[in-house]
UniProtKB/Swiss-Prot annotation:
Sequence similarity: Belongs to the bacterial PQQ dehydrogenase family.
Function: Catalyzes the oxidation of glycerol to glycerone. Also acts, more slowly, on a number of other polyols including D-sorbitol, D-arabinitol, D-mannitol, meso-erythritol, adonitol and propylene glycol.
Protein's UniProt keywords contain Coiled coil: no
Extent of Polar residues compositional bias: 46-58
InterPro entries named in the record: PQQ_b-propeller_rpt (IPR018391), PQQ_mDH (IPR017511), PQQ_rpt_dom (IPR002372), Quinoprotein_ADH-like_sf (IPR011047)
GO MF term set: glycerol dehydrogenase (acceptor) activity; quinone binding; quinoprotein glucose dehydrogenase activity
Keywords on record: Oxidoreductase, Secreted, Signal
Organism lineage: Bacteria, Pseudomonadati, Pseudomonadota, Alphaproteobacteria, Acetobacterales
Protein name as annotated: Glycerol dehydrogenase large subunit
EC nos: 1.1.99.22
Biased composition (Low complexity): 34-43
Keyword Transferase: no
Main location class: secreted
C-alpha cells in the first residue's frame, strides 16, 4: 500500500537537529529475546485460537454491490482463449539477458534487475557539468475538475535507436534518445474513472518474437499492463497494435475476476516475460472490503496473448481460467510490485501483499496466511509455486512487499557461486535467499514478537523473521525522548500523543480502544524504488524511510459514522474517504483509521529527523555499511506546508530508487525536495544536484546515444508525497553531447 507523508522543517530546528542526523546509526535488528526454533519461511504463522468464519463461500462469493461496470475498458474486449503450457513457443534470445553497453532494456536495465549500467562517461569529476539535454512532455496531468491522483513513477527503457516510455495514463511513446523528438505515440484511451489511488505507469516490457520473422511487424514489441486492466502489445517500430496478440493487440485482464468497478483493480508495473510467458500481477485497492477482487497471478503466451495458467491461492491445484459464472477466489493476497523473472530457473519471483482488509487477519484462510507478505517463486511452466519465503507472519501492518527482487551471485561455502535473490522490505529487513530454493543464504532468525494482541479471534504470530546477516535499514525503536517539535509546546503535544498510544516496538499489535504506533511505517524501510547493485564493486545501494504511523481500528458503527465505505458501494464518492489510508474494511468487524505520526497543527512528524536515508552496503566483504547519509534537503519542505528554501540535508521521506554506474556514480531523485542528485558511490558525497520541475518520485535510468551518456528521470511528482505534479521527462548530459 502506498500513502502520503507530510514533512515540515523549520530553519532553526534543521540546524539544531544536525547533530542528531550526524549520529544516526543502524539499529540492531531489534529486541526480542532468544531466537525461536521455528523455521522462517512458508507457513510459519500462528493460527487463530477461536473458530472464525472462513467459509469457502466467502472466497467464491461476489461483491454485494455493483456489477462489472461498462466504464472498464477491458470489459469491452472478448474473453481470451486458453492454451496448454506445452504450446507456448520457445522464446527467442532476449536483449535483456545481455544488454548492449549503452542500452537500458528492462525496468531494472537487465534480467537481474540490478539497476547498474557500465557507462562511465559521467564521473564524480565531471558530473558538476551536467545540463538538461532535452525535456519531453507526456501531456498526462490532472485537468480542471479532476482530483489530483497523478504519480507517474515511470522508468523509460532504451533499446537500439528508441527511448520508450509511457504516460501516467498508459499511452506508449517512442522518442529519439539523443534529441527527445517523438517518433510515435500509441494512445490507449484509459479513462479518468479507471484511476485507482494513483495514475502510474512504471514502464513497458520489450520482447522479441520467435514466431514473427525479423523485419516483420511485431517481431520486436512492447508489452504493457494498463490501469483499466488490459494487456497490450504494440510494434516497437511503429506503435501499431500487434494484430495476432489477443484481440487486435489487447487482452481483457478482467476475465475471471468477477464483479468490480473502475479503479478497484489495476496494473501499474511492467510485466516480465519468462521463457515465453508474460506474467501478470495487479493492484487491488486497499482498505475496501474483505471479499475484494482476487489477487490471482496469471501467465499468458507472449506471442499470442492466450491464457496459459493461473495461481489462485485458495484454488492452488486449479490453474485453469474460470468459465461461465466461476471466478477466481476473492480477497486473496495481491501483488502490485514489479516482479523479477529468471529464465534459467524458469521462475518468476512475486512479491506479495496481504489479503484484502490489511489490518484484520481472522478471516484469512490457511493458504493466504502462508503466502502473504512473502516472496513466491512460481514455475512459469505450470503456475505452481516452487517455494515461498515469508517476510512478516500474519501481517496486519501493511508490510506488503513493494520492492522488486534483485538477482546476483554470492560466494558459496565450497567455492562455488550461489544464485541469490535480494529482497528488500518495508520493515527495513533485507533478505538474501538462494533463488533456487528460497532458503536464506545469510542468517535469518525467528525472534519472539512482542504481544499476541487484543483483537478477539485474531492473535498475532508468536515470532517474526529478522535478517541478522544484513544491516537493518531502520533506527532503534522509538522512545518518548525522540519526540520533538518547533517549540516546547509542539514537543509536549507529541510526547502526550506518544503516551496515549500503544507501543511496544516493532509489531505492536492493532487495537480498538486507542491508537497504536506502527514503526517501521508502511512506506518503509524500503518500498517500490527497490535497490541498485554494482556487480563490479559489490556495492548495494538502498534508500529508505523513517516515518512512523499512528493507526487505530474502529468499530463498524464508528466506521459508518466516519463515512468509510468501499469503492463499489453505490454511495461511494471519490475523494470521500475509504480509498487509501482510512478504510472501511467492509466484511470485517472493523474499519481502519491511519495517519502519519505527526503534529497535525504544523504538519511536522513527531519523531526527530532524519526521515529518509541512503546507505551503501559492501556485499563482497561481510555486508558492512560503507557509508550512510540523510537523503533530501529542507528546501521544499517546512511547517504548514511552507518551503524553507534551506539546503541542509535533513533527510526527507522518499519514494523511488537509484541507478549505479560504471563511472562510480549513483543517480537518485526520490526525496521530497524535488531534486535529482549524483552521489559518489564510494564516499556518499553529493557531487551534483539539480532542481526538477516536479517531484522525482521515479527510478532514473541512463543510456548512451551518439557516443554520449544521458541520464533520464520522470519528474512526474507524487500526489500522496505532496510533491509538485508535472508531465516532464527530463534528460541530462554533459555539454559535448548537447552540442551535437
Amino acid at each position: 500500500m502506498r500513502r502520503p507523508y507530510l514533512l515540515a522543517t523549520a530553519a532553526g530546528l534543521a540546524l539544531a537537529c544536525s547533530p542528531l542526523i550526524a549520529h544516526a546509526q543502524f539499529a540492531p535488528a531489534g529486541a526480542g529475546g532468544e531466537p525461536s526454533s521455528s523455521v522462517p519461511g512458508p507457513g510459519n504463522a500462528s493460527e487463530p485460537t477461536e473458530n472464525s468464519p472462513k467459509s469457502q463461500s466467502y472466497f467464491a462469493g461476489p461483491s454485494p454491490y455493483a456489477p462489472q461496470a461498462p466504464g472498464v475498458n477491458a470489459a469491452n474486449l472478448p474473453d481470451i482463449e486458453s492454451i496448454d503450457p506445452s504450446q507456448v513457443p520457445a522464446m527467442a534470445p532476449q536483449q535483456s539477458a545481455n544488454p548492449a553497453r549503452g542500452d537500458w532494456v528492462a525496468y531494472g536495465r537487465d534480467d537481474h534487475q540490478t539497476r547498474y549500467s557500465p557507462l562511465s562517461e559521467i564521473t564524480p569529476e565531471n558530473a558538476s557539468k551536467l545540463k538538461v539535454a532535452f525535456v519531453y512532455h507526456t501531456g498526462s496531468y490532472p485537468r480542471p475538475g479532476q482530483v489530483n491522483k497523478w504519480a507517474a513513477e515511470t522508468t523509460p527503457i532504451k533499446v537500439g535507436d528508441g527511448l520508450y516510455t509511457c504516460s501516467a495514463m498508459n499511452d506508449i511513446i517512442k522518442l529519439d534518445p539523443a534529441t527527445g523528438k517523438q517518433i510515435w505515440r500509441r494512445n490507449v484511451d484509459v479513462k479518468y474513472h479507471s484511476i485507482p489511488y494513483t495514475a502510474a505507469c512504471k514502464g513497458v516490457t520489450y520482447f522479441t518474437s520467435s514466431v514473427v520473422p525479423e523485419g516483420q511487424p511485431c517481431h520486436n514489441r512492447l508489452i504493457e499492463g494498463t490501469l483499466d486492466m488490459r494487456l497490450i502489445a504494440v510494434d516497437a517500430e511503429t506503435g501499431d497494435f500487434c494484430p495476432n496478440f489477443g484481440h487486435g493487440g489487447q487482452v481483457n485482464l478482467m476475465q475471471g475476476l468477477g464483479e468490480s468497478v473502475p479503479g478497484f483493480v489495476s496494473m501499474t508495473a511492467p510485466p516480465p516475460v519468462i521463457n515465453g510467458v508474460v506474467v501478470v500481477n495487479h493492484e487491488v485497492l486497499d482498505g475496501q472490503r474483505r471479499w475484494a477482487p482476487s489477487g490471482v497471478i496469471r501467465g499468458y503466451d507472449a506471442e499470442s496473448g492466450k491464457f496459459v495458467w493461473a495461481w489462485d491461492v485458495n484454488n492452488s491445484d486449479d490453474h485453469s481460467q474460470p468459465t461461465g459464472n466461476r471466478h477466481y477466489s476473492r480477497g486473496t493476497p495481491n501483488s502490485w510490485a514489479t516482479m523479477t523473472g529468471d529464465n534459467e530457473e524458469g521462475l518468476v519471483y512475486v512479491p506479495t501483499g496481504n489479503s484484502a482488509a490489511d489490518y484484520y487477519s481472522a478471516l484469512r484462510s490457511d493458504a493466504e496466511n502462508k503466502v502473504s507478505s512473502a516472496v513466491v517463486a512460481i514455475d512459469v511452466k505450470t503456475g505452481s509455486p516452487r517455494w515461498v519465503f515469508q517476510t512478516a507472519h500474519k501481517d496486519v501492518w501493511d508490510y506488503d512487499i513493494g520492492s522488486q527482487a534483485t538477482l546476483m551471485d554470492m560466494p558459496g561455502p565450497d567455492g562455488q557461486t550461489v544464485p541469490a535473490l535480494i529482497m528488500p522490505t518495508k520493515r527495513g529487513q533485507t533478505f538474501v535467499l538462494d533463488r533456487r530454493t528460497g532458503k536464506p543464504i545469510l542468517p535469518v532468525e525467528e525472534r519472539p514478537a512482542p504481544s499476541p494482541g487484543v483483537i478477539p479471534g485474531d492473535p498475532r504470530s508468536p515470532t517474526q523473521p529478522w535478517s541478522v546477516g544484513m544491516p537493518a535499514l531502520r533506527v532503534p525503536d522509538l522512545k518518548e525522548t525522540d519526540m520533538w517539535g518547533m517549540s516546547p509546546i509542539d514537543q509536549l503535544f507529541c510526547r502526550i500523543k506518544f503516551r496515549r498510544a500503544n507501543y511496544v516496538g516493532e509489531f505492536t499489535p492493532p487495537s480498538v480502544d486507542k491508537p497504536w504506533i506502527e514503526y517501521p511505517g508502511y512506506n518503509g524501510g524500503s518500498d517500490w524504488g527497490s535497490m541498485s547493485y554494482d556487480p563490479q564493486s559489490g556495492i548495494l545501494i538502498a534508500n529508505w524511510n523513517i516515518t512512523p504511523m499512528y493507526d487505530q481500528l474502529v468499530t463498524r458503527k464508528k466506521a459508518d459514522s466516519l463515512g468509510l465505505m468501499p469503492i463499489d458501494d453505490p454511495n461511494f464518492k471519490p475523494g470521500g474517504g475509504g480509498a487509501e489510508g482510512n478504510g472501511a474494511m467492509d466484511g470485517t468487524p472493523y474499519g481502519i483509521v491511519v495517519t502519519p505520526f505527526w503534529d497535525q497543527y504544523t504538519g511536522m512528524m513527531c519523531n526527530r529527523p532524519p526521515y529518509g536515508m541512503i546507505t551503501a552496503i559492501d556485499m563482497k566483504h561481510g555486508q558492512k555499511v560503507l557509508w550512510q547519509h540523510p537523503l533530501g534537503t529542507a528546501r521544499a519542505n517546512g511547517p504548514w506546508g511552507l518551503p524553507t528554501g534551506l539546503p541542509w540535508e535533513i533527510g526527507t521521506p522518499n519514494n523511488g530508487g537509484s541507478v549505479v554506474t560504471g563511472g562510480g556514480l549513483i543517480f537518485i531523485g526520490a526525496a521530497t525536495d524535488n531534486q535529482i542528485r549524483a552521489i559518489d558511490e564510494h564516499t556518499g558525497k553529493v557531487v551534483w544536484s539539480a532542481v526538477l520541475p516536479g517531484g522525482g518520485q521515479a527510478n532514473p535510468m541512463t543510456y548512451e546515444a551518439n557516443g554520449h551518456q544521458y541520464v533520464a528521470i520522470m519528474a512526474g511528482g507524487h500526489h500522496f508525497m505532496m510533491t509538485p505534479v508535472s508531465d516532464q521527462l527530463v534528460v541530462y548530459a554533459l555539454p559535448d553531447a548537447i552540442k551535437q
